[in-house]
C-alpha cells in the first residue's frame, strides 16, 4: 500500500415525523453510522485503488476499524497486475455489493412511476415469470436494526412484509398513493421507495459458485449506469477477476458487461 484516499467516519440520528389532514400524526427515531476506508496499492504493474466500508443503525454493530482496513488492503492489492480481455461470452458472477445494482433496476422497473408512464421493461408482467424459478424476493420493513426499516411510508400508509418475487414470478408492484391511483390499484406502502429488500440466499457461498462456474468472470466493481429502463438493455464498465478451472486466475479491468436484464434475470 503506497497511499490512501482517506477514511470517513459518519454518524447521524434523527426523528421522522409525518402528519396529514386525516388526523394522522406519527413518527420514529432513526440512526445511521458508517466507517469507510480507501487505499492505493502499487507495484511494477502500476497502481490500483479500492476500499471497504461498514454501515449500521447501531454503532456497536459496525466492523472494527482494523477489519475494514484489512479488507480495503486485500481488495486493492489483489487488483494489481490487472489485464484486459478480448470479446467473449462467458458466465458472470456479480459479487454481492455490486449485485445490488441489478435489483435496484428491478425495483425501478416495478415502481408505480415507471409503470404509469409505461417506461418499464417489466410492463404487464405481474403473475408472469421474470426471474429464474429459484429466486424469491421480499420487502421486510420491520427488521430490527435494519437501515431501511419503517412503520409507514412517506404517505403515512402502513408498511408490511411484501412478496415481490415468488419462485421467479412477479407477484406485486411497489406503489405510492399517487401512482396507485394512476394505475387504479391499491397503494403498497412504498411512497419513498422500498424498505429492506431481501433476496433469499441460495445454498452455495461465493467459493462454491466459482468452482461450479469453472470458467468465467467474477465482477467486483462496476462503473457508470448503462441501463435502459424501457428496454432492459444493460451495458456497464466493470473490473474483477478471470476464473479458470474453478479458481481465480488473475484480475481484469476495462471490460464491458453487456446483455438484457429480462434475459439476465431469467438465467440467474
Locate predicted features.
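Active-site bordering "gate/hinge" segments
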Residues: 1-150, 154-160, 166-169, 247
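Dual-mode signal for accessory low-complexity, basic/Gly-rich regions
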Residues: 125-268
Amino acid at each position: 500500500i503506497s497511499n490512501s484516499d482517506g477514511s470517513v467516519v459518519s454518524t447521524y440520528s434523527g426523528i421522522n415525523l409525518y402528519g396529514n389532514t386525516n388526523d394522522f400524526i406519527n413518527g420514529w427515531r432513526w440512526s445511521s453510522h458508517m466507517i469507510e476506508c480507501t487505499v492505493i496499492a502499487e507495484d511494477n504493474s502500476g497502481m490500483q485503488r479500492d476500499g471497504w466500508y461498514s454501515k449500521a443503525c447501531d454503532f456497536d454493530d459496525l466492523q472494527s476499524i482494523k477489519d475494514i482496513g484489512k479488507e480495503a488492503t486485500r481488495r486493492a492489492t489483489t487488483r494489481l497486475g490487472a489485464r484486459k480481455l478480448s470479446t467473449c461470452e462467458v458466465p458472470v458472477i456479480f459479487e454481492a455489493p455490486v449485485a445490488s445494482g441489478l435489483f435496484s433496476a428491478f425495483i425501478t422497473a416495478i415502481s408505480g412511476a415507471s409503470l404509469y408512464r409505461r417506461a418499464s421493461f417489466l410492463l404487464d408482467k405481474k403473475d408472469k415469470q421474470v426471474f429464474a424459478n429459484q429466486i424469491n424476493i421480499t420487502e421486510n420493513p420491520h427488521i430490527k436494526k435494519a437501515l431501511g426499516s419503517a412503520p409507514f411510508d412517506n404517505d403515512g400508509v402502513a408498511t408490511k412484509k411484501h412478496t415481490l418475487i415468488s419462485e421467479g414470478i412477479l407477484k406485486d408492484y411497489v406503489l405510492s398513493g399517487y401512482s396507485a391511483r394512476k394505475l387504479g390499484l391499491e397503494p403498497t406502502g412504498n411512497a419513498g421507495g422500498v424498505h429492506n429488500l431481501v433476496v433469499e440466499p441460495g445454498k452455495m457461498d461465493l467459493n462454491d459458485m466459482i468452482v461450479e462456474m469453472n470458467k468465467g468472470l467474477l465482477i467486483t466493481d462496476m462503473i457508470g449506469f448503462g441501463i435502459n429502463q424501457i428496454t432492459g438493455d444493460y451495458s456497464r464498465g466493470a473490473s474483477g477477476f478471470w476464473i479458470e478451472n474453478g479458481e481465480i486466475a488473475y484480475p481484469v479491468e476495462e471490460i464491458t458487461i453487456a446483455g438484457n436484464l429480462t434475459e439476465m434475470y431469467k438465467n440467474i
